[in-house]
């Protein structure tokens, strides 16, 4: 049986793995086996955190809306219910942006929602 030299193929695969873990510390960015383990862990974390980011932003929007709505003596759940019943097509992201950037517009949205029901 002839000898198979895998230098080019193996080097290409190793370099691809080492490129993924370029910012890691110590052996995780220099040696292939620890780098491969680190790359798998990194990809798993990034997959998990993409979904986590959506959850975190929703929490942030709810907190901002709640803080603004409390100034008008209305609870968060009541405000969302009123806005949905008045058929306003505003999601939590838009409401949070309006609450932070333009408080008077948010006030008019809330009063319109209260008086339309």
Curated annotation (Swiss-Prot):
Gene Ontology annotations for the cellular component aspect, listed alphabetically: chloroplast; ribonucleoprotein complex; ribosome
Q: Which InterPro entries match?
A: Ribosomal_bL20, RIBOSOMAL_L20_CS, Ribosomal_protein_bL20_C
Q: Which coarse location class describes where this protein primarily resides?
A: plastid
Pfam families attached here?
Ribosomal_L20 (PF00453)
Q: Which UniProt keywords apply?
A: Chloroplast, Plastid, Ribonucleoprotein, Ribosomal protein, RNA-binding, rRNA-binding
Give GO BP annotations, semicolon-separated: ribosomal large subunit assembly; translation
**Cystines in this chain:** none
By sequence similarity, the record places it as follows: Belongs to the bacterial ribosomal protein bL20 family.
Instruction: Please explain the role this protein plays, according to its UniProt record.
Output: Binds directly to 23S ribosomal RNA and is necessary for the in vitro assembly process of the 50S ribosomal subunit. It is not involved in the protein synthesizing functions of that subunit.
Q: What is the name of this protein?
A: Large ribosomal subunit protein bL20c
Say which species the protein is native to: Zygnema circumcarinatum
């Amino acid at each position: 049986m002839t000898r198979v030299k895998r230098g080019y193929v193996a080097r290409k695969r190793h370099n691809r793995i080492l490129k993924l873990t370029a910012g890691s510390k110590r052996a995780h960015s220099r040696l292939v086996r620890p780098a491969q383990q680190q790359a798998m862990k990194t990809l798993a974390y990034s997959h998990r955190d993409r979904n986590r980011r959506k959850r975190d932003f929703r929490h942030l929007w709810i907190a901002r809306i709640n803080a603004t709505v409390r100034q008008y003596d209305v609870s968060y759940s009541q405000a969302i219910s009123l806005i949905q019943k008045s058929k306003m097509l505003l999601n939590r992201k838009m409401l949070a942006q309006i609450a932070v950037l333009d408080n008077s517009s948010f006030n008019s949205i809330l009063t319109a929602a209260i008086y339309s029901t």
